[in-house]
């Protein structure tokens, strides 16, 4: 199965997690020029840079192992690392996300006055994949893509728009632009018997010519899809919609990730853009056996930081995507108690990860949550609901089943059956 999208997004992440949970093998093609990819991911550039399994082996390059000219040296100031030629700084090294590992993400090469003239990109396997050449104004001129042997394989003349494939056959291919290159890459990687889930509507006319009978479109929203539905075999919707808003002819995926095997753990989480979380301090004191994980994409205000000394409170200011996914995995409770806007679709992410959504009628971010068994009219009722959860062994599975029924989440077995039939080419009965 091949997923095609312009770039990684919440929707592609959800779809990949769903397929992983089903054990369905897939590949992903992003129609961008990313070169730091895993083995299941292809981009327009990586399709030229990576050619064997060996290319996906290795570790990020430790900064001190970076090759530099004789007598040049690396000099570190905290997390900032420079390359010196003995007199002047000739480059700066940008480290990968985990700064403690001190591995190389980019090298910015300097000209006169430390003006950046070129940028080298390094991948997670420790080799250079790209060099960008800049003009005197810092504008990109050319992107040069390399294979593991550091041979030039693709040139992208950015301002003119065209690209040159410097393949091993000794004969250059010229592409007039990104669309021309995309067609060539699709021809190269598509398998004749492979179903496609496409998230880029601009590619549908091209894909209709190459894979007309097993073409599925996937969108976050169900709005404005009428013209697309007529061009594909099936349409998947990743976001949640209440039953009364759903439209015929569409397959809704929200909730299909639930495997029904999660056991209750006394871990509660909330993602907030506001320091005002109704009743949080009282819950923290009333239920010392519950760990409260409070996350934000930015810094936190004093109403939250003052809780940091509590042994059952864990704060995550500026939370990373990896930390967020880990909280979703290990928590069983989501607190929809924060005022202000909902951060992304965090409540839906929590529900899809089999969290019980606890909240007040005055704080929940979606009106249809008010009918859930763990949404209450008062704080006192909310506290009592927490006590029931901790004292009654069957409360969590029963309330979770009720939550799923009220929200009419997708049935996992039906989605699995659909995807299985899609893989097996039984397209005459591909519907739910």
Per-region residue spans from a language model:
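N-terminal subdomain of nucleotide-sugar transferases
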Residues: 1-67
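Repetitive, compositionally biased segments used for assembly/scaffolding
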Residues: 70-180
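A charged, aromatic-enriched C-terminal amphipathic alpha-helix characteristic of glycosyltransferases
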Residues: 391-432
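Catalytic binding pocket for nucleotide-activated donors in carbohydrate/polymer assembly enzymes
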Residues: 333-405
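Donor nucleotide-sugar binding/catalytic pocket of nucleotide-sugar-dependent glycosyltransferases
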Residues: 196-198, 212-264
């Amino acid at each position: 199965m091949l997923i095609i999208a312009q770039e990684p997004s919440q929707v592609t992440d959800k779809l990949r997690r769903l397929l992983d949970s089903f054990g369905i093998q897939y590949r992903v093609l992003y129609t961008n020029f990313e070169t730091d990819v895993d083995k299941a991911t292809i981009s327009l550039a990586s399709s030229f840079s990576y050619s064997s399994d060996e290319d996906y082996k290795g570790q990020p390059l430790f900064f001190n192992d970076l090759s530099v000219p004789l007598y040049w040296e690396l000099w570190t100031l905290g997390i900032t690392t420079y390359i010196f030629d003995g007199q002047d700084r000739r480059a700066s090294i940008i480290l990968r996300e985990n700064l403690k590992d001190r591995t190389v993400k980019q090298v910015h090469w300097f000209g006169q006055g430390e003006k950046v003239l070129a940028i080298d990109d390094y991948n997670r396997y420790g080799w250079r994949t790209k060099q960008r050449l800049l003009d005197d104004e810092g504008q990109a001129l050319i992107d040069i893509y390399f294979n593991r042997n550091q041979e030039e394989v693709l040139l992208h003349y950015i301002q003119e728009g065209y690209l040159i494939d410097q393949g091993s056959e000794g004969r250059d291919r010229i592409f007039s632009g990104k669309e021309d290159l995309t067609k060539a890459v699709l021809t190269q990687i598509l398998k004749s018997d492979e179903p496609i889930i496409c998230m880029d509507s601009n590619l549908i006319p091209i894909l209709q010519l190459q894979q007309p009978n097993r073409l599925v479109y996937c969108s976050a929203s169900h709005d404005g899809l009428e013209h697309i539905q007529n061009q594909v075999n099936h349409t998947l919707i990743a976001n949640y919609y209440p039953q009364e808003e759903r439209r015929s002819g569409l397959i809704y995926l929200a909730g299909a990730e639930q495997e029904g095997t999660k056991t209750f753990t006394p871990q509660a989480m909330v993602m907030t853009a506001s320091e005002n979380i109704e009743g949080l301090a009282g819950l923290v004191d009333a239920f010392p056996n519950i760990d409260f994980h409070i996350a934000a994409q930015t810094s936190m205000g004093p109403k939250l930081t003052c809780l940091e000394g509590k042994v059952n409170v864990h704060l995550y200011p500026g939370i990373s995507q990896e930390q967020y996914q880990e909280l979703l995995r290990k928590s069983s409770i989501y607190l929809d108690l924060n005022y202000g806007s909902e951060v992304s679709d965090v409540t839906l992410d929590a529900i899809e990860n089999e969290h019980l959504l606890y909240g007040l009628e005055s704080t929940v971010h979606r009106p249809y949550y008010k009918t859930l068994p763990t949404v209450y009219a008062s704080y006192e009722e909310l506290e009592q609901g927490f006590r029931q959860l901790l004292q009654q062994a069957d409360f969590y599975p029963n309330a979770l089943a009720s939550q799923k029924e009220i929200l009419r989440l997708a049935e996992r077995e039906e989605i699995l059956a659909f995807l299985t039939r899609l893989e097996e080419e039984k397209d005459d009965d591909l519907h739910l």
